[in-house]
Amino acid sequence: MMNSNLVPFDPYYKKRITYVWRGQQFAFDVAHTIFSSFQIDEGTDLLLRLIEPAFSEPQRILDVGCGCGVIGICLARRFPQADVTLVDKDLLAVRYARHNAELNATTNVTVLGSVGLSEAPPGPYDLIVSNIPAKIGDYAIEHEFILEPLRHLRPGGEYWFVVVSGLNHLIPRLGPRHNLRLKEIKKRAGHSVYRIIAPAATMPTGGL
């Protein structure tokens, strides 16, 4: 576990980014090769400013593809009663997300290395979030970042995610294709935020 005083000596360390969300100050140390290492990604910021889950006090939250941990750590601060799990396939991202959880005193965060959700604790989760990577291909996005997370939601749970506008050719088609309760929450230059609500009874399985 990295100590905040030692981070500048880490060979991958790039800089510390400050971020204000819901009136609270956060700090995130980032590495050279981690996604969005210059500033908080605009899609991440848009998602965080829009997310309002129906469960006012979610007990279990999952951040898929967490990067350095911005979304999950912010939600852990907002919902201190929740058990928040962050997963990423990049072990350097995992290392920095763990450090940033400590840096921001979010003791309710667990960070795990995981390809997709293979190592994530089993659901159900009340809330799942993701800034979906754009360059992994339509099939992987559909199956690994849309349908698979839905398997881990509790009935009535919510999946909030943001995508770059280049994926708007794909995401809206997935609603009718898999009978999903999919809604576009907001479109802003470069990004769109969506929400899927899991059915009250059976999880979607079409196409798997």
Q: Positions of the model-derived regions?
A:
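N-terminal auxiliary segments of SAM/dcSAM-dependent transferases
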Residues: 1-21, 36
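Class I SAM-dependent methyltransferase Rossmann-like catalytic core
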Residues: 30-39
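Conserved SAM/SAH cofactor-binding pocket of Class I
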Residues: 43-121, 130
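Conserved proline-anchored active-site loop of SAM-dependent methyltransferases
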Residues: 64-68, 125-137, 149
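A short glycine-rich, Lys/Arg-flanked "PGG" loop and its adjoining helix->strand segment in the class I
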Residues: 143-155
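Conserved beta-strand signature within the Rossmann-like core of class I S-adenosyl-L-methionine
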Residues: 156-163
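Conserved class I S-adenosyl-L-methionine
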Residues: 164-178
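Core SAM-dependent methyltransferase catalytic element
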Residues: 187-208
